[in-house]
Structures are given as structure tokens and as C-alpha cells.
Amino acid sequence: GTCPGCDLMEMWALHVDWANPGNSNLTALPGIQLTDWDQTLCGSGSDWSCMSQPGTSQKLDPIREPLHYPLQYRNFGTHETLVGCFAEDVDGLDRAAVHWFELRDTGAGWSLFQEGVYAPDEYNRWMGSIAMDDSGNIALGYSVASSALYPSIRYTGRLAADPPGLMPQGEASLIEGSGSQLTTSSRWGDYSMMAVDPLDGCTFWYTQEYANSQGNWQTRI
């Protein structure tokens, strides 16, 4: 987050020889440069909780450093894809946004096909999960909260023909939270999951956390 030009995806290729495990190998691939991002949400140190909630000084942990859920893979024959996302500080003031990306391999190795940062307003968005269906359409789900918005579940998306780097299909609410998390742990999510139904290849399923009026976390599919 403090080294311009240093933000990249590191990738490895794993070859497994089940008949002769000694022939298996793990090979580092060339790094893939992404647009520079600031991952220093909540500063440094042991307390990384800074996602505000209404009516309490207790804040939520944005899980700032890892990818939010494993990358999801598809093989379209002409190309392979990997989609993923993580949280970043979008304004330098600890406002969390979802940084998403799509990698492609058309036969010459993996490269960045598109990326974007979803931050349409002043709310924090984090703990995302992203998936692509059989037609190349993408759905992105995430947590959303602020000092004026209880922790809730929302989603957005893009069609395969939409302009690259954008989520222009608008934001929708799956469920609005009715309280703030008041338990002793500030951990939140760990993690959410967006998946495509294998029966039809186009129905997205999403599971995520939100807070109820009793100050307890709940999950919803």
C-alpha cells in the first residue's frame, strides 16, 4: 500500500504426478501487476478494527490482508479465468471498498483482463466474494456498514458485455441489518461465499453475515 508500482498478484503452478510423487513440482509464475491499492485499513498494530457501526464504539475487523475467499476458476475452452477480490482503503481515511479482478489465460500465460474498485458511496464495503457464470457474467457480494448503517448484505454485478472494470448493474440489498454486533470479538465474516449452481450454470448462490436487533451476528443464504 505504500510502494507505488509494487502491488501485484503472485502466482504458482502446481503439477502433481500421482503415480510418481517425486516428479511433482511447484513453479513460480510471473507476477501480475494490479492498480496500486492501499491495504492499510485501520492502521497497523494488533487492533485492526475500524469499520464503524451505529450506536456503539465497537468496530468491526475488515480482514484487510488476505484475499476474500479463494479465487474462482472457469475454463471456457478459448480461455481460462480466475476472479477474486479483497478489501482496500479507498480514500486514505479507512473507508473500505472491494477491489475485484479477473485474470485470463488464452494460452500464453495468466494476465490481468480487468479490475475495478466498488465504492459507490460513503459506506464501508468489505468481506466480498465474487463468481462468474457460464456466460461470463459476474456477481459480487459483500458486507456493508457505517456509523449510520447496521451491518448488512448487498451485492452488485456485471454482464459479460458490460464495459471492462465496472459493475454497472447496480447495487441491491439481500438483507438489511437491524443491529450492531456487540459480542466481544470484532471479527466479521471469515468469510463469505458466492457460488454458481452447477445444475444450470447461471444461478448465483451467496452466503454472508449480518447483525440482528439483539446485537448478534446471523447468516443468510
Role assignments for model-derived ranges:
Residues G1-I221:
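C-terminal PAP-associated
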